Amino acid sequence: MNKGLSPSRQMWNRVMTALVWASAVLVMVLVAGIIGMVLVRGIPHISWKFLSTTASVLKKTDGILPAILNTLYVIALTLLIVLPLGVGAAVYLTEYASNRRLIEVIEFTNETLAGIPSILYGLVGMLVFSQALGFQTCLLSGSLTLVVMNLPTIIRTTQESLKTVPQGYREGAMGLGAGKWHIIRTIVLPCSIDGIVTGCILAVGRIVGESAALLFTAGAAEVIAKGVVKAYTSNGATLSVLLYLRAFEDGDFASAWGIGAVLLVLVLAINLAARLAKIKLKQKQ
């Protein structure tokens, strides 16, 4: 393939190929190293008692069950709100909006919001959801703050995926007499499932790893609420917040490594479930 190239270009091609391979290997080594370090240091501290109890000085336990439940509650409510809003906004911008200037303004605003530090979202969430709307410091306020944080990501990934659907698909369906919404529901959205799943995975990663915004809005209590409704209206620490508290407030780094390992496994499990759901949807399509 490189026979027609001059010796200098062949050398340059080899150098660039080597650099690309070196970059790929470096990334894989870094990822494997981080995952390995967290698992090696965290797994020895994980036990059934660690996962199924509440932290108690009297009982001498450092369980994280409340934080696990709080994390799952926050993930569920945030995705339940942000996915319909984000996908709907992306569909409007791609399929319905005709004012190009308006679209550009919205896209620019969306990109700007995606780059705002999470601690600012936490401050705004505290002022709006916790104080102005009277929700107080609770999981509901934290979840709504995370909805605002993750909305730009969902919109952007879904919008880019919608743009990859060939225009001929839409025109062909329209020629057969299909309506606009029918085309979107049966052709455009199924073809865009990759982008939607990608946005979902990115959102889950940000939700699980967020601590600054949740410290302002959700709180840091380690108590199991009685019922789902009570949980959302109660102060509660997620796993990422608890990791920070154990490591930097209590100095319990062994427990912090255990929480880190649980977080890592949780993210991997949710990502795997999202990938499997995408495969199932593609098979149905």
State the predicted function of each range.
Residues 3-22, 36-78, 99, 245-254:
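Periplasmic/extracellular loop-to-transmembrane helix junction in inner-membrane transport proteins
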Residues 56-58, 62, 214-264:
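Interhelical loop and adjacent transmembrane-helix boundary motif
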Residues 69, 73-81, 85, 89, ...:
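Hydrophobic alpha-helical transmembrane segments of multipass integral membrane proteins
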Residues 78-110, 123, 275-280:
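Transmembrane-helix boundary motif in ABC transporter permease subunits
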Residues 79, 158, 180-218:
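Transmembrane alpha-helices
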Residues 93, 159, 163, 201, ...:
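C-terminal transmembrane helix and the adjacent membrane-cytosol boundary/short C-terminal tail
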Residues 111-147:
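Generic hydrophobic transmembrane alpha-helix motif, especially the helices
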Residues 117, 176-177, 190:
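Glycine/proline-centered hinge or cleavage motifs at structural transition points of membrane proteins
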